[in-house]
């Protein structure tokens, strides 16, 4: 430090210098040390995930999300909160979800569950809005009677399965089709006590945690003086692998959602036209190791852990989609083939990843205890999916429901290995099935994680540019 600089940093200048040093310290810790290295509870390093996602997964999953089979999602945003009296929905205009009018939805999508791979439709590759949806292809009427009977069996099986999340009844009058591309996940202004109540309920009541242990930075917890959260992590490390994994999945999902909000933040609005983009200040508020007392980097590591879990699920479910009987049907033969080819290409990439999480390490104890723990795990997660109906912002609720359903589908896949291995090639299996709703949620949820990791790289670059 030069003599001139020493003289300058007095009084208010000293405060400014300290702030500058804090910023540089954040950059250094984030880029070089805090979010690097090997993840806990697995043998994968963050740098390998970054490269794999950037060069193999992200470009393809982004294209897949733009395919019409994966862009339409039927969801009930009017289900009442089952846990407390919700004090109304968010009135902020950016919270609003614009559904596709029923009359605009292609016939192929409205066909319902009688043909589970024919519930999306498109014949145009560039669809600007729902107004053009009626141009899409209709259902292929050349299905054999045998296939139609098989589809009925599939629907029966779907209704009887034990899911890891609460599924919306697509036949409910309150369920609506939403074009995900027209309703992107981004910062809406939804915050405060309502948002905190949702996440507090998730963490405090559904993460195998006693009430006497408080997670760090919980604004609803009683004051703990100088406690920086180490007591929480001491407790967490003392848990079995399965319960640690559960917490990391929820924390990773929370981190991913926060990254989306920071990356697509309402920066300004002029002449009624909003401008969205990355907000570095908001990113620092949520992830800066200084501002979050070390929590930010832990959250980001949990994001990578969640990415590994869903990546593993995609690699395990590949045989299900590789069968000739599975066709992501839209009514346009050429487009159908392209969509499936792209999906299978993504599956091939997921199988090539060399450092997968080993799900066999979970629920590996005595059979009775493992079965009981697995059921508790499933019910806790299913409860979290129900909490998403308590989110006051419609757009936040939409993406919260989709991403919890996607993770729930991933967990269902990971714990159905034997059923997937025994799938028949040319006929439906009663041992394992996925609904179209689950397929759309699974791939879009993983796409959100892939985007989160890509956005994290963008924030690192922005911060480095500011040095």
Curated annotation (Swiss-Prot):
Membrane topology: Peripheral membrane protein
Localization annotation: Endoplasmic reticulum membrane
UniProt-listed InterPro entries: Ero1 (IPR007266), ERO1-like_sf (IPR037192)
SUPFAM superfamilies to which the protein is assigned, alphabetical: ERO1-like
Keywords linked to the UniProt accession: Disulfide bond, Electron transport, Endoplasmic reticulum, FAD, Flavoprotein, Glycoprotein, Membrane, Oxidoreductase, Redox-active center, Signal, Transport
Disulphide-bridged cysteine pairs: 81-390, 90-95, 90-130, 100-262, 207-240, 393-396
GO molecular function, one term: protein-disulfide reductase activity
Pfam families referenced in this protein's UniProt entry, alphabetically: ERO1
Top-level EC class: oxidoreductase
UniProt subunit comment: Homodimer; disulfide-linked. Heterodimer with ERO1A; disulfide-linked. Also detected as monomer. Homodimers may be somewhat less active than monomers. The abundance of monomers and homodimers may be tissue-specific. Interacts with P4HB. Interacts with ERP44.
Purpose of the protein: Oxidoreductase involved in disulfide bond formation in the endoplasmic reticulum. Efficiently reoxidizes P4HB/PDI, the enzyme catalyzing protein disulfide formation, in order to allow P4HB to sustain additional rounds of disulfide formation. Other protein disulfide isomerase family members can also be reoxidized, but at lower rates compared to P4HB, including PDIA2, PDIA3, PDIA4, PDIA6 and NXNDC12. Following P4HB reoxidation, passes its electrons to molecular oxygen via FAD, leading to the production of reactive oxygen species (ROS) in the cell.
Family: Belongs to the EROs family.
Protein name: ERO1-like protein beta
Protein species of origin: Mus musculus
Gene for this chain: Ero1b
């Amino acid at each position: 430090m030069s003599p001139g600089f020493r003289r300058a940093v007095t009084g208010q200048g000293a405060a400014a210098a300290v702030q500058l040093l804090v910023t540089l310290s954040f950059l250094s810790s984030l880029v070089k040390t805090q979010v690097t290295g090997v993840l806990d509870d697995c043998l994968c390093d963050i740098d390998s995930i970054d490269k794999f996602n950037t060069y193999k997964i992200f470009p393809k999953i982004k294209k897949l999300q733009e395919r019409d089979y994966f862009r339409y999602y039927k969801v009930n945003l009017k289900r009442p909160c089952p846990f407390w009296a919700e004090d109304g929905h968010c009135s902020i205009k950016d919270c609003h979800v614009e559904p596709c009018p029923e009359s605009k939805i292609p016939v192929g999508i409205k066909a319902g569950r009688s043909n589970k791979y024919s519930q999306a439709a498109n014949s145009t590759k560039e669809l600007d809005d729902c107004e053009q949806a009626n141009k899409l292809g209709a259902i292929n009427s050349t299905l054999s009677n045998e296939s139609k009977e098989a589809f009925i069996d599939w629907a029966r099986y779907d209704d009887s399965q034990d899911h890891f999340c609460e599924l919306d009844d697509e036949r409910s009058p309150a369920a609506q089709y939403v074009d995900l591309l027209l309703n992107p996940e981004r910062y809406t202004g939804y915050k405060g006590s309502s948002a905190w109540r949702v996440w507090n309920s998730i963490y405090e009541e559904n993460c195998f945690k006693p009430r006497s242990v408080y997670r760090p930075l919980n604004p609803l917890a009683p004051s703990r003086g100088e406690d920086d959260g180490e007591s929480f992590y001491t407790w967490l490390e003392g848990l079995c692998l399965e319960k640690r994994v559960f917490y990391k999945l929820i924390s990773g999902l929370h981190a991913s959602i926060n990254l989306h909000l920071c990356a697509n933040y309402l920066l300004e609005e002029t002449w009624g036209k909003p401008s969205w983009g990355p907000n570095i200040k908001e990113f620092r508020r949520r992830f800066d190791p200084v501002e979050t007392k070390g929590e930010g980097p832990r959250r980001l590591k949990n994001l990578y852990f969640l990415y590994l879990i869903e990546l593993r699920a995609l690699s395990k479910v590949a045989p299900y989609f590789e069968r000739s009987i599975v066709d992501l049907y839209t009514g346009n033969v050429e487009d159908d083939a392209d969509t499936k080819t792209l999906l299978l290409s993504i599956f091939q990439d997921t199988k090539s990843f060399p450092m997968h999480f080993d799900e066999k390490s979970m629920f590996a104890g005595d059979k009775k205890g493992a079965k009981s723990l697995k059921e508790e795990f499933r019910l806790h997660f299913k409860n979290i999916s129900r909490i998403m109906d308590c989110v006051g912002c419609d757009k936040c609720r939409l993406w919260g429901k989709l991403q919890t359903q996607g993770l729930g589908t991933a967990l269902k896949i990971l714990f159905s290995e034997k059923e997937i291995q025994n799938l028949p090639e040319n006929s439906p299996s009663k041992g394992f099935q996925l609904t179209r709703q689950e397929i759309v949620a699974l791939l879009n949820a993983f796409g959100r994680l892939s985007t989160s990791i890509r956005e994290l790289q963008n924030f690192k670059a922005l911060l480095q540019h500011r040095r």
